[in-house]
Amino acid sequence: VSTYIGSEQFPSRLSTPDPIEFHSILRRMDDAGVEVVVMEVTAHALAQCRVAGLAYDVAAFTNFSQDHLDYFGTMERYLEAKLLLARQAKQMVVNVDDEHLALAVQQGRFLCPVKTVGIRARADIYAKNIEVDERGCNFLLCFHKRFRIPVQLRVPGIFNVYNSLVAAALCNAVGVDQDSIRRGLEAVRTIPGRIELLNTGTPYHVILDYAHSPDALENVLRAVRQTARARVI
């Protein structure tokens, strides 16, 4: 977990820091002339009011799955905590291929305008003609059925197609042009600990991934099995 200001990297103890540390980071960013901040807002941070008073131009939900029940107790309480983010956002980007989030959209639980993304479900921004191998994904990025952009993603796994859809929708919401979105997605390289293919010199592939929840592990195994030519151990 790290914080970046330009090319400078700072270690972080939490995905969403406590308020004192967080506002100190924002102050440092402002002093450096930063105009756009991209951050992860955890359910814990929302429940503990770590980001109270902030207003987001746009926010996103990538998925919702079983996690942190030791803290929240039930899936409904966990979802309620995550939905607090919509109260602080001018608009939301939501993956409606996730059945929990699709239901929340149908029930009107987001208190702001919603843009949807997906592969299987009808969505405002979606991917089609998806091809996946062990090195990456090729797909057609479609915006509101008006224009389409071919994307060559250099990280593998169908879940990274979903991540790309969310990133594209966020950028589109704040006025980034389509060519810049494509170039940004295609510039992404392997993230350490996220389906990271290790160079071990062995006749088989070794993959490192941080997957720590049932949903995350399922996604990793599905991604590996899509391209594996032999047994997955």
What are these regions (language model features)?
Residues 21-24, 163-169, 219:
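Short amphipathic alpha-helical face segments that pack within enzyme cores
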Residues 43-53, 215-224:
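Switch II of P-loop NTPase G domains
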Residues 30-39, 47, 51, 55-205, ...:
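Acidic, Mg2+-coordinating active-site environments of NTP-dependent enzymes
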Residues 10-42:
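Conserved nucleotide-sensing/catalytic segment adjacent to the nucleotide-binding pocket
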Residues 209:
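Conserved phosphate/oxyanion-binding catalytic-loop motifs
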Residues 8-19, 65-73:
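Flexible beta-alpha connector loops of hexameric P-loop NTPases
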Residues 1-4, 41-42:
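Short beta-strand-centered segment that lines the nucleotide-binding/catalytic pocket of NTP-utilizing
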